[in-house]
Amino acid sequence: MSFKVNWNTLETDSLREWTSQLLTDALNSGKRPPILASDIQIKDLNFGKVAPDFEILDIGELDSDRFRGIFKINYSGDFHLTLHTRVQANPLTIYQENSNASDAAFVTPNFLLASDPFALPLDLKLSDIRISGIGIIVFSRLKGLTLVFRNDPLDSIKVTSTFDTVQVLAKFLQNQIETQIRDLFRETLPTLIHRLSLKYLSSDDSSFLDDLRPQLAALHEETVSLMDIDPDVPYSPENLSRVSALFKSRETLRLAVPKIRHSVQRCRLEKFTKTQPSLVRCLHDNLNLDLVAAPQHTNEIPVELVSGADFSKTNHVLREISSIQASNYYRSSSSRPKRRVIKLGSKKSSVKSTPSAETLASPIPSEMSSATASEHVSPTKYYQNDSHISLYHPKPRQADGAAALQLANPQSYLYHNVSSTPQLPSNSSLLAGIGLGNNYFNFASQSQISTSPIRRSSQELEDKKVTGKKSINHLDIAQLNSKLNATLHTIPDVKSHPGTGRKLDTGFEMPPPPPYQV
């Protein structure tokens, strides 16, 4: 059984546009390869004048709404298709895009200007198509038409492009296009035929309504915000003509100017503001104040309303303003508004600041302290201690090169930064050592050699109580201070050695023996 197809009925603009749209969507449906700089467009589509030969080999099922059969198709006509796209001619750009796609950007070098895209236009023309294949057709009034090929129907195809002068590119394009055409007959063409059959053979009213709803929704006016307006998009001629006619309608001296919907004109602005509620208008209506009777251009109240000498009037105006604001607030919210309250005549709570830690005063002369206090007043209160006796860690010095201590002032003796080497007691033995509690045979000595006392104040000595068992290295600072004070009052005058004439530091240095005399 064979059929004769009237091929000329396919030469319609509507079918050509619809087929071009389907092919464009199918060619750009997948992920675009990096070598293509733009989408693929259908530049020319012509079905030709020669119809294909269609032969039915077997009919498996035949009914009023169903059909299943095996057919054979042969085509060697003048159908041609022209595609237009742009290809990327810079290989560095392709390499960089592939690296970014494979998450290897951290090892991809930055080529700067060398990786800028360079696109070239490309036109592909497909003609002289030879098709010979066996397929299976399954038709259903509800599910449409399904077409599947048993073999590869493409025999040959001619590919011409703008790169035919380069033989390598021409051969590469020929192989790639043949591969894509075979995929087209295997996957894309059955999908297109199925959609075409559903468009013309669907008898369900629900599908018709589903297609009609988006078209009706597109007819409704959509709100346009200021952010949706793109200044780079050109205006349509229809909108420009409407704006021009509206502008010319305002260039007149007539009193009857046509109104603009959903807008307020400047000439009618006063009528609009009179009906608009405001604080000034509410004050004028409630209190009948002459001061706000004049037309106001803003919603601000005159300052003379609240700056008058009469407190009762000012209080009355402020209460009215508060009531207007409260009533306006309660229209949109049910919660109580927060107001700032200022209490007049309240006593300030006096908080006595107690110092966290008392600061000990350093021995500064009274003249210097008074001069410093007159120049800069510090908020810090110093603790005044009557007793100025404190101990500093002295520096040991040699006995022969030391200068004599100036003992005119007893206090300078305490704060002197040098001291002679301490002397061992007269009853010392091998058990005595130089270190702190150092014993040769690990026996406690009766008189241990101690280091110089740590700096402490008399107040701390009185407050701090040592409880418990005392260690070997314990120093009784109070006893040392008392002995030191007693020593200061009994220090004799500085004497010199009769033989050498060198001054002696009494209390820390023993005089050397006299020179040997024969």
Curated annotation (Swiss-Prot):
The keyword Mitochondrion applies. One of its GO terms (molecular function) is lipid binding. Residues 1-198 form the SMP-LTD domain. Signal peptide: none annotated. One of its GO terms (biological process) is phospholipid transport. It is a multi-pass membrane protein. Residues 336-350 have a biased composition (Basic residues). InterPro entries: Mdm34 (IPR027536), SMP_LBD (IPR031468). It comes from the Eukaryota. It is found in: Mitochondrion outer membrane. Its main location: mitochondrion. Residues 492-506 have a biased composition (Basic and acidic residues). Keywords: Lipid transport, Lipid-binding, Membrane, Mitochondrion, Mitochondrion outer membrane, Transmembrane, Transmembrane beta strand, Transport. Residues 335-369, 491-518 are annotated as: Disordered. One of its GO terms (cellular component) is ERMES complex. The keyword Ribonucleoprotein does not apply. Lacks alpha-helical transmembrane segments, suggesting that it resides in the membrane via beta-sheet conformations similar to those predicted for other outer membrane proteins and porin. The SMP-LTD domain is a barrel-like domain that can bind various types of glycerophospholipids in its interior and mediate their transfer between two adjacent bilayers. Component of the ERMES/MDM complex, which serves as a molecular tether to connect the endoplasmic reticulum (ER) and mitochondria. Components of this complex are involved in the control of mitochondrial shape and protein biogenesis, and function in nonvesicular lipid trafficking between the ER and mitochondria. MDM34 is required for the interaction of the ER-resident membrane protein MMM1 and the outer mitochondrial membrane-resident beta-barrel protein MDM10. HAMAP family: Mdm34. Belongs to the MDM34 family. Component of the ER-mitochondria encounter structure (ERMES) or MDM complex, composed of MMM1, MDM10, MDM12 and MDM34. This is Mitochondrial distribution and morphology protein 34. It comes from Meyerozyma guilliermondii (strain ATCC 6260 / CBS 566 / DSM 6381 / JCM 1539 / NBRC 10279 / NRRL Y-324) (Yeast).
